Regions:
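A structural signal for multi-pass alpha-helical bundles of membrane permease subunits
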Residues: 1-168
């Protein structure tokens, strides 16, 4: 647990070059998965899932064993349905982080047609003057997809955050 928390103190800029090499080895350069996967596998995600799993009642697992479920069956039929809020919360937070990131997508994406909105807004900045009306309108377009995803999964997100934060 200490090592997971300690890795949260390492700045992402230090991890970028090894992650870049890993994405090249996995042939994930210039793909959306190459942008999103590092956020899904971060230390904060692991720590959140650990805290969420500690709060699961052991009686449910024992009841599954008594009913004749294998360990795989317990995982699929009991644990996964209970952890939907945690998965939804982490998916929303990871997607928001990937969507709003500037430097990592600039490294992963090579084609201009795959650039994310922050990269596109960055290309509008010029040393000769900026059109702030266009930048602010573009920023609003950056908020809309995340807002729609949040509104669709709001119940799961709030359940996941509350359950993972409070042990009882």
């Amino acid at each position: 647990l200490f090592l997971v928390i300690a890795t949260m103190m390492v700045p992402f800029e230090i991890l970028m070059l090894p992650l870049y090499q890993e994405m090249m080895d996995l042939n994930l350069m210039n793909t959306t998965a190459g942008v999103i996967l590092p956020g899904l596998c971060g230390a904060s995600t692991i720590f959140f899932f650990r805290q969420y799993m500690i709060g699961l009642p052991k009686d449910l697992l024992d009841a599954g064993r008594i009913d004749g479920c294998t360990e795989y069956g317990i995982c699929v039929k009991i644990i996964l349905p209970i952890t939907k809020p945690a998965f939804a919360s982490m998916a929303i937070l990871s997607t928001m982080g990937s969507w709003n990131n500037l430097l990592w997508p600039m490294m992963v994406y090579r084609d201009a047609d795959k650039f994310t909105l922050p990269i596109g807004l960055n290309t509008l900045l010029t040393p000769y003057g900026n059109n702030y009306d266009v930048l602010i309108a573009g920023s609003m377009f950056g908020i809309i997809p995340i807002l729609v995803v949040f509104l669709c999964f709001q119940r799961y997100f709030i359940d996941g955050m509350v359950t993972g934060a409070v042990k009882g």
